[in-house]
Each structure stands twice: as structure tokens, then as C-alpha cells.
Amino acid sequence: MISSNDLRPGVSVEIDGAPYKVIEFLHVKPGKGAAFVRTKLKNMQTGNVVEKTFRAGEMLPAATIEKVNMQYLYSEGDNFVFMDMETYEQAPLSAAQIGSAVKYLKENMEVAILRWKGQVIDVELPNTVVLEVVETDPGVRGDTATGGTKPAKLETGAEIQVPLFIKVGERVRVDTRTDTYIGRE
């Protein structure tokens, strides 16, 4: 059990039989009445975001989420095959189970698979990945003075905005949480 006073971003709780992850929280102490905690929660099964309010000190059941380190091996049709780093067991996951993480998956990449009651609910990518630019418009001389950006397609199929000086074949570092360019490799 977790007290509502201990809720922080990233903490997992179980509400109405479903796992939720705290995205935002605000502890409110009104002039009159009891204090309460206003939260924004993400359902880890469906991805829906809901706002809930709890009384200060209210006890909530903790969601027991198992984190397993796995390595992405290859894709086979609509399935993506991962290998457990400890037991070497292989597990196929569908694109629906992986969600938006699929656009950054590269062979031999290590990821964390989150399970709740034996069911895969999320794939955690590394915060940054290094990928090669396979398609982008050529930069024109003198373009960098404005600090503009242009779209670029990466080797995994993901599309991000990159600075104008980036060329096809260059390796760029990308933040997987915000889908933004960080720098050249």
C-alpha cells in the first residue's frame, strides 16, 4: 500500500484493477477543509490519461510491476522477438504490445519489458539511441544562420526534425522520450 502523500511521477499504483503510472501530482492545502492530492495518471494497459483526486493520507494499492531486461533480436512479420538477458528465453511481442517504441527498435538493442500479472504492458527504451539518417533534404549553403530544422528519416523508419547541416549517412543521437534530435555522433 502507498500513501497518497508518497505519490511522485513514475510511481505505479493499482486503481479499479488496472495499473496506473503517476505522470503529475500536486499536493493542495486549501484554506478551509482537508488537504488533498490531485494527480494525472496514465493507464499502463490502454495508455489513457485520467485525472484523479485523493484525500491526503489515503492508502492506495501498489501495482507490482516486474521489469525484465531483454534484447531485441529480430522482427518476424508482425511480431518482434526479444531474448531474456538472464534465461536466454525468446519471447515474441506484437506491434500493439510494443506501442510507439517500435519506431526506435534496432537489432541487438537492450530494452526493459514491463509486466503486470504476467501480461506485457510496456517497453522501456534507453533514454537516447544513436541512429543513421537514411533520408533528408540536402542542406543549402548558408542555411545554418537561421537555426532551422528539416525532417529526416532514420534507419528504423522514425521521422524526426534535425538541424539543416545534417546529411544522409550521418549518425545522430535521439531522445526516445521526446522524439527530438540531441546531437551528432
Curated annotation (Swiss-Prot):
Gene Ontology cellular-component terms listed: cytoplasm
Q: List the disulfide bonds.
A: none
Entry-linked InterPro entries = Elong-fact-P_C, NA-bd_OB-fold, Rib_uL2_dom2, Transl_elong_fac_P/YeiP, Transl_elong_KOW-like, Transl_elong_P/YeiP_cen, Transl_elong_P/YeiP_CS, Transl_elongation_fac_P
**Localization per record:** Cytoplasm
Question: Mind listing the UniProt keywords for this protein, alphabetically?
Answer: Cytoplasm, Elongation factor, Protein biosynthesis
Q: Name one GO biological process term.
A: peptide biosynthetic process
**What family is this protein classified in?**
Belongs to the elongation factor P family.
Q: What is this protein called?
A: Elongation factor P
Q: Which organism is it from?
A: Synechococcus sp. (strain JA-3-3Ab)
